[in-house]
């Protein structure tokens, strides 16, 4: 997984990149939790998402938002971070112009950014949102949700109560044929401290079971 840098709106962005052997492999971008609360691309859950995509044959990129690690710039309350995410997806897609499909994903704050990017990129086929902070941020932009995806939370999450996510999903309108799969891991806190393997297994299972269902990009 080589270290890479690419240009973002606030300067250089650092990332970790896994390249699949198949040039038509699907691609995925992974976004980390809140930069001001210790979130980085090396956060355990962020890495687990990245690893799950790689094991499923994706070319995948995780990166540090502006002001984190060696990424240039300063925290921008989600606005600049969304621009960073768009730049990351553009970079990855440029490496794989023949990709069979695009997925985006994130953990906590990163899932809020990922879902905003989903609304701006009709070429995204599916999403993974791990512990989206539904009670802390406005997710009303998600209605109607344009793509199918997977939402996961721990039932002991002290930051994102599962009830907040369940309320969000009930209120979220969906376009025709869009399905959002919801999974709750019993006993898990926000960081899945004792449930890392279960988290990884559920992510991998969802990805593998939906690979063929993601619409292929037109040539």
Question: Where are the regions a protein language model picked out?
Answer:
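Catalytic histidine-centered segment of alpha/beta-hydrolase-like enzymes
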Residues: 73, 188-200
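Short alpha-helix in the alpha/beta-hydrolase fold that links the catalytic acid
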Residues: 161-171
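Acidic catalytic loop of the alpha/beta-hydrolase fold
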Residues: 155-160, 190-191
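Catalytic histidine neighborhood in serine/cysteine hydrolases
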Residues: 172-191
